[in-house]
């Protein structure tokens, strides 16, 4: 059981990292700073940084907000997640 829990934790970390990579990639493609994305999504710049590095798990509503601001389909952000 402990091994399966470790696998699940590792899988979640990889998925969060991939989500963060996708968000950062789209943000940079739009030439937005973390600060500007934070302003437009009403979250802190630190939270944007933590999301982009996979250190926190944003709510689905926050991911939808980010997708809207970046003008991309949410599926682009959750690709390979």
Segments the model singles out, each with a brief description of its role:
Residues 21-40, 65:
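Short basic helix-loop element that most often maps to the first helix and adjoining turn
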Residues 71-81:
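Short C-terminal boundary/hinge segments that cap the last helix of small helical domains
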Residues 23, 37-38, 48-51, 77:
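Conserved hydrophobic/aromatic packing and binding residues within compact polymer-binding modules
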Residues 42-56:
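Recognition helix of helix-turn-helix/homeodomain-like DNA-binding domains
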Residues 55-65:
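Short, basic-rich loop-to-helix N-cap that marks the start of a DNA-contacting helix
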Residues 3-29:
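A short, Lys/Arg-rich alpha-helix, primarily the initiator
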């Amino acid at each position: 059981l402990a091994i399966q829990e470790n696998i699940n934790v590792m899988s979640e970390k990889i998925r969060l990292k991939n989500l963060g990579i996708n968000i950062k990639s789209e943000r940079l493609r739009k030439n937005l700073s973390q600060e500007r994305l934070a302003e437009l999504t009403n979250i802190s710049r630190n939270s944007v940084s933590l999301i982009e590095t996979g250190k926190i798990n944003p709510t689905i509503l926050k991911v939808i907000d980010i997708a809207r601001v970046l003008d991309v389909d949410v599926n682009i952000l959750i690709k390979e997640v």
